[in-house]
């Protein structure tokens, strides 16, 4: 076994983590689950804001991948109109959550294909695994404001909109 093979085996080994990427839409949320590189993510859909559905799908994914109930769950989603309440809920569930600056997500400029949720979920899950394996330049993680800071920002946005 040469150095590159050894590195690849180490990089793709399942360390017992469940990775979860969200694609947040206005009507539905798409969830992509994986336990390691080299596999397509398990994709599920819940209604937007359905926290019971999110929790249920996390538990189903643990069972599907044969993971214990106490397995480390890492999640990510792009910062946007939904704010940070989803992050707070996930942390409350014991999920390690990252909110990603959408402008920092790498894009293949040569690709002449449309952006789709399926590509986004697969890419997000892969990038989350890369980030977890120490590749910090994959994207920029947003600093999470306190609930009070977020509320004051929202009040300001509402006043500007009027």
Question: Where in the sequence are the language-model features?
Answer:
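Phosphate- and other anionic-substrate recognition elements at nucleic-acid/protein interfaces
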Residues: 1-162
């Amino acid at each position: 076994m040469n150095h590159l093979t050894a590195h690849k085996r180490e990089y793709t080994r399942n360390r017992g983590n469940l990775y979860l990427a969200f694609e947040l839409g206005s009507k539905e949320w798409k969830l992509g689950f994986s336990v390691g590189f080299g596999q397509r993510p398990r994709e599920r859909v819940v209604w937007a804001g359905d926290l019971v559905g999110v929790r249920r799908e996390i538990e189903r994914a643990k069972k599907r991948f044969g993971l214990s109930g106490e397995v480390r769950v890492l999640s990510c989603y792009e910062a946007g109109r939904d704010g940070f309440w989803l992050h707070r809920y996930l942390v409350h569930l014991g999920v390690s959550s990252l909110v990603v600056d959408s402008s920092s997500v790498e894009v293949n400029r040569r690709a002449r294909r449309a952006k789709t949720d399926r590509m986004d979920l697969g890419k997000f899950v892969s990038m989350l695994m890369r980030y977890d394996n120490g590749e910090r330049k994959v994207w920029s993680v947003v600093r999470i404001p306190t609930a009070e800071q977020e509320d004051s920002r929202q009040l300001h946005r509402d006043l500007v909109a009027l």
